[in-house]
Amino acid sequence: MSTNGLDEYWVPEHVKDYLRKLGFVLPLDDMEPWIRSWDDWMSARGDFYDYRDKDGMGRVYAVHRRSIHPAMRVCKEWGSLLLNEEVKVVCEDQKATDWINSFFSSTNFMNAAQTTVVRAFGLGTGAWALWIDLGKRKVRIRHYDARMVIPLSWDEDGITECAFVTRAFYRGKSVDQLQMHLKGGMVFSPDSSSPSTPSPEYAEGLLTNESEETYRIVTVCFDHEGNELAPVGILPVYDTGCPFPTFGIVKPAVTNTRVDMSPYGQSVFADAVDAVQAVDLTFDALINEIDLSKMRVFLSDVLFDREQDGNKNVTIPFGKQDCTVFRKVMSTEDTIQEFAPALRTSGQIEAFRVALQMLGDLTGFGINYFDMDDSRGYVKTATEVSSDNSALMRNIRRHENSLEGSIVSIARAVMHASRSFGESIPDEGETHVQFDDSIIQDTAAEKEQDMREVGVTMGAWEYRMRWYGEEESVARARAAEIGTSSVSGGSGK
């Protein structure tokens, strides 16, 4: 990703025009300015960070404000708190549980998903969607952020049809790849897909078919001029046979107050932009204070060597040295004089601390999450602040509830598509996500406490269900097996 944002990928206008001619209204048009703004804050770009000023002589010069990228830090913190390798999908059938978690592990899904969550919490929306390799008969998951996601059909219950736009490369040239995940009631005809040649029996390339309710993945490619391409090996329309969405939309549990009724989400720092500015403003002021307070050394003219330069006898300079050594012209007194300005960092640090507290409070972490530790001088860890931070715990649960539906949706779609390729996967039944809260909770202590309760207020199978994610029948069987083995081992002594 380019540091200046010039090379970042955004949906090209010819792709938007193609979707409009198919009859779709694009909610991206209203949200894109906000998404671009949030993207700039995450990358510390824009007029706040790079601007021009004038000196006393009226000369214009460029100024760059230093940044610790607070907006990105907020998003990364949420990503690390919500998703890691210990997060598991738990199905009603244990074999389905084992299969889907093995799939996620082998495809490194959770690591990539954490990055998706980081971008989604920063830009307001993200997604993961099925990607089918028919040649290898493999199912994979592709990850997208708000720049590449275009909802096509939605209501209060969520997004039911969606398009994803990415850059791909075909024969050494970049192409724009549009993939539409359309519900079974809408059949896409590749012959009439071109908006320039509509067919009378199709409504702009789409035909209602009430008899089918499965999802189809429609792929269209364009060159940089907007001309449609037909790359070898790309199937224009693929019926997944899946009756539920073949994608999952990732959004933070934050109400979108920027565009009313939009299917897009809102950035977690959308209402904290002033706090982001305050953090970087105080950080830059702190660095400037230290830089301007460096010791200055003034040396008498007699300490400098001289050399002949034509008809002139010039002083040999020491070098720039960041403007810390100065020459006193025509001076022989006090050959070496030091000047050390007093540091005012205590006030700067206090302002920086207040800005961090405000940022944490406005982004859902609570006022103490980014607070600075007096003994160590930097921010505390999540575990240190979570014990007395009810705001953080409440918001974690809200975001987990929002994220669970997206993970379950893509997990079910993966299992359904894999069955069509011959994978023996039982029906998953009721499915939920077991999140890992060990980062913010003392999980070891909780497990130990539950272990003490086994045989008193909790059965061994209940312990296994909670801590090993096993379905009830498996947990009961394994608990009984372990108990029998213990009895047999004891009787043999």
Language model: regions and residue ranges:
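Extended, regular secondary-structure scaffolds
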Residues: 115, 120-123, 127-266
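Extended, non-catalytic structural segments that build the interaction scaffolds
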Residues: 43-61, 327-362, 379-405, 428-465, ...
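Extended, charged amphipathic alpha-helical segments
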Residues: 226-387, 434-438, 442
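Extended, compositionally biased alpha-helical segments that mediate assembly or anchoring
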Residues: 478-493
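Short coil/turn segments at secondary-structure boundaries
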Residues: 115-117, 131-132, 290-301, 369-375, ...
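Extended, helix-rich architectural segments
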Residues: 1-171, 491-493
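Generic structural marker for isolated residues within well-ordered, non-membrane alpha-helices
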Residues: 100, 114, 356, 411, ...
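Short acidic alpha-helical/loop segments enriched in Asp/Glu that coordinate divalent cations
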Residues: 364-379, 409-431
